[in-house]
Curated annotation (Swiss-Prot):
GO terms for molecular function: transmembrane signaling receptor activity. PANTHER family: HIGH AFFINITY IMMUNOGLOBULIN ALPHA AND IMMUNOGLOBULIN MU FC RECEPTOR, POLYMERIC-IMMUNOGLOBULIN RECEPTOR. The keyword Transmembrane applies. Residues 17-462 are extracellular. Residues 220-232, 280-291 have a biased composition (Polar residues). It is a single-pass type I membrane protein. Glycans are attached at residue 167. The chain crosses the membrane at residues 463-483. Residues 61-169 form the Ig-like V-type domain. InterPro entries: CD300_family_receptors, Ig-like_dom, Ig-like_dom_sf, Ig-like_fold, Ig_sub, Ig_V-set. Interacts with IGHM; this interaction facilitates the endocytosis of IgM-coated microbes or IgM-antigen immune complexes. One of its GO terms (biological process) is adaptive immune response. This is High affinity immunoglobulin alpha and immunoglobulin mu Fc receptor. It comes from Pongo abelii (Sumatran orangutan).
């Protein structure tokens, strides 16, 4: 009979489900403090989606409180708040944040208030305690899928005391579509957002800048990168890298309109902005092809500009990138064939500086004479080209076919690198700053400039330097002589003062007759006294 009972017990134990042996510290329930929050840690695994549902029924009344589900995005950060009872014991206790497993019954400390941080979480986790508020905050940054799992935030010298369990999940970034805006007429709209793919609604990093004037805007898609778009009521942007712009009704009529150009991404190959068309040539359409090649610090950029009657394109090819990016800008003209602007390709690197500085030196007042317009700079010996029809007046009258070489109005512009067009071997550096109003372009080698009508100004400026030098030397010699004269006068005054002091000291040593005793003074003044006379003192009779 006893043998049969033993066999039944063994058979029953073989059909029982295997259970994990609990932690030895949890076997003695009576020895645990009253604030201990018991949980079945053996059943908590990092792979379980809700790690806090399988808990023990033992819960302390002052257990920690906080969020049970924390979610973040890859590369982002999460903030976890753990509230505890603000008692005097809890304020000074150790606060920690740990992760369960592996093995599943061990909670490995990530960060605690004892200045401990796990080596895998350094520079991305921080724990801040607020004892007066009964709160400590854990912040985890640079999230990755490896951070998914179950975590505990608790109080106590060990990680099995008073704690709160939570589940951390990493979710994918939200998908979005490209918005469509409808600003009012003449409104400038600039947005910075990702660009959308024509197939899916996933965004890729990039920046699209929209600039235009009209009543309706419709942007569909673009490629990753940086681009500028000009659109209006009749224009629609198609998927790709080509932007179409159609002017509105009468809103682009006044003034000169700047045609947008693609913004290059490389800082070394920064191209200058398009130069606006002069007022005299607003109704004229140029048809030519200009190609300029220059080499920057890090990349070689070839700019080719094609201007035709019906459309204009700007093509930018970058040689330092593994792929070829082509940005095109096409402007459709209206029925009257109105030229919105002149798109001129950048010719040389020095043109960038000239465009920034030359407008300060181009305008010349009508009150200036002809000599101030056609002069050259003696120190630099360089000529700067200008446009008489746009900004320069000769004797107060605008001209059409005459190119005037004029001196930069400020030394700051010439030293910063104006366009210096010199004859002879300076040919490659010559660049026109603006298009001529009427007439063909004139090469810098031909003598088509209006030179100074007063050549004697140059000789007078040359003789001015020696005269100023001699004048400076003369003034220096006069100052030296004056200083010597003052020094001699000061020396003579000091010598006279020393002599006077010595005489005063001598008179103090030899007393005057008034300072002698009364008897001696009487003897000196008494001339009637005989020569043999002598003063005798009466003798006293000695006493008995």
């Amino acid at each position: 009979m006893p043998l049969f009972l033993i066999l039944c017990l063994l058979q029953g134990s073989s059909f029982a489900l295997p259970q994990k042996r609990p932690h030895p510290r949890w076997l003695w329930e009576g020895s645990l403090p009253s604030r201990t929050h018991l949980r079945a840690m053996g059943t908590l695994t990092p792979s379980s989606p809700l790690c806090w549902q399988e808990e023990s029924s033992f819960a302390a009344p002052n257990a920690l409180k906080g969020s049970r589900l924390v979610s973040g995005e890859p590369g982002g950060a999460v903030t976890i708040q753990c509230h505890y009872a603000p008692s005097s014991v809890n304020r000074h206790q150790r606060k920690y944040w740990c992760r369960l497993g592996p093995p599943r019954w061990i909670c490995q400390t990530i960060v605690s208030t004892n200045h401990y941080t796990h080596h895998r979480y350094r520079d991305r986790v921080a724990l801040t305690d607020f004892p007066q508020r009964g709160l400590f905050v854990v912040r985890l940054s640079q999230l990755s899928p490896d951070d998914i799992g179950c975590y505990l935030c608790g109080i106590g010298s060990e990680n099995n005391m008073l704690f709160l369990s939570m589940n951390l999940t990493i979710s994918a970034g939200p998908s979005s579509t490209l918005p469509t805006a409808t600003p009012a007429a003449g409104e400038l709209t600039m947005r910075s957002y990702g660009t959308a793919s024509p197939v899916a609604n996933r965004w890729t990093p990039g920046t699209t800048q929209t600039l235009g004037q009209g009543t309706a805007w419709d942007t569909v898609a673009s490629t990753p990168g940086t681009s500028m778009t000009t659109a209006s009521a009749e224009g629609r942007e198609t998927p790709g890298a080509t932007r179409l712009a159609t002017p509105g009704t009468g809103s682009w009529a006044e003034g000169s309109v700047k045609a947008p150009a693609p913004i290059p991404e490389s800082p070394a190959s920064k191209a200058p902005a398009p130069i606006p068309e002069s007022p005299a040539s607003k109704s004229r359409s140029m048809s030519n092809t200009t190609e300029g090649v220059w080499e920057g610090t890090r990349s070689l950029v070839t700019n080719r500009a094609k201007a035709s009657k019906d459309r204009r394109e700007i093509t930018t090819t970058k040689a330092d990138r593994p792929r070829e990016d082509t940005e095109g800008v096409r402007i459709a003209l209206d029925a009257a064939k109105k030229v919105l602007g002149t798109i001129r390709p950048p010719a040389l690197v020095s043109e960038t500086l000239a465009w920034e500085i030359f407008p300060q030196a181009t305008p010349v007042s009508k009150q200036q004479s002809l000599s101030s317009i056609g002069e050259t700079t003696p120190a630099a010996g360089m000529w700067t080209l200008g446009t008489p029809a746009a900004d320069v007046w000769i004797l107060g009258t605008p001209t059409a076919d005459v190119w005037t070489s004029m001196e930069a109005a400020s030394g700051e512009g010439s030293s910063a690198g104006d366009l210096d067009a010199a004859t002879g071997d300076r040919g490659p550096q010559v660049t026109l700053s603006q298009a001529p109003a009427v007439g063909p372009w004139r090469p810098p080698g031909k003598e088509s400039f209006v030179k100074s009508t007063f050549p004697e100004d140059e000789s007078s400026s040359r003789t001015l330097a020696p005269v100023s030098t001699m004048l400076a030397l003369f003034m220096l010699m006069a100052l030296v002589l004056l200083q010597r004269k003052l020094r001699r006068r000061r020396t003579s005054q000091e010598a006279e003062r020393v002599t006077l002091i010595q005489m005063t000291h001598f008179l103090e040593v030899n007393p005057q007759p008034d300072q002698l005793p009364h008897v001696e003074r009487k003897m000196l003044q008494d001339d009637s006294l005989p020569a043999g006379a002598s003063l005798t003192a009466p003798e006293r009779n000695p006493g008995p």
